[in-house]
Amino acid sequence: MRYFFLSISLIILLIGCSDYKTVEIISENQNSRIDYIVIHATSQDFDESLETLTKHSDYPVSSHYLIPESVREDENNYFGKELPVYRLVDEHRRAWHAGVSSWRDEVSLNDRSIGIEVVNEFDCEYTNDKNTDKSVDEIACQFLPFPVEQIDLLKLLLIDILERYPRIDPVDIVAHSDIAPDRKSDPGPYFPWKELYDIGIGAWYDMDTYDKYFQIFGTNLPDIESIQSALRVYGYPVEITGINDQQTKFGVRAFQLHFRPSNFSGDMDQESLAILFALIEKYRKHELNAFSGILNIV
């Protein structure tokens, strides 16, 4: 290594200068690296969350932002009664929040996403730890609601982020469970996705379109391969196997946690399927013809 630096120094002497000039001409052919926003819940209290997200460990994780659940009454609170956002990683740097993940066939979402952790002490455990093949039926979760002031602060943060990255598509504002359905359940069924949609953040379905598909499907659901294809078209990392296997049930469960939180069993039903196709028609309309056989589209 010492000889390497000596060689570099010699080259600089031979060239006769130690710096160089640049001409900056901004190309029109570029865009932001940020295409996704991933929302998490911490499953820890604030102090534990902050330590987990900022200190080195055997399994290091981080996020760009952390939102507390309430104003902190201690010496570290410099904001009075105002709830602050904690910025932990600069948006132009990669935070380690998504883990093994996929959305719309894009993998390793850490590279192109902003991660937001919302403090919420929910808890999920597998009831059968000895079973290496995880099953939807073996997940036991205790979910908790989110305080109004916490969600109001999240709204302000999201509006601010979207002003900087206006090209982020509504369907690409996702839950951790959306992009890692076999591993994650956060932020959970109490997270107010519809409330965010009502102020222009994220995706949601239209009721008239939902009613149309609810009537189309009736009590006769299409084959499992069509269901897998529809989930995949919208963005969920579900392999098309033609079998109602566990990876499919995890995908359905993640979808239900986001869009039909009243029942997230992982079993596809008429209501969930109508919501899914209402979303596809709204946000993936160019893909709808692929399902003409089951929708009787002429």
Model-derived regions: residue spans:
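Positively charged n-region of N-terminal signal peptides that target proteins for export
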Residues: 1-4
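Bacterial N-terminal signal peptides
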Residues: 6-14
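Active-site-adjacent loop/helix surface patches within enzyme catalytic domains
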Residues: 20-167, 171
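Second-shell loop/turn segments in exported
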Residues: 26, 51, 102-105, 136-149, ...
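Acidic, His- and aromatic-enriched active-site or binding-groove loops in soluble protein domains
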Residues: 29, 66, 189-213
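Surface-exposed patches in mature extracellular/periplasmic domains of secreted proteins
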Residues: 161-176, 239-243, 264-267
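Short acidic, glycine/serine/threonine-rich helix-capping segments at coil-helix boundaries
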Residues: 217-288
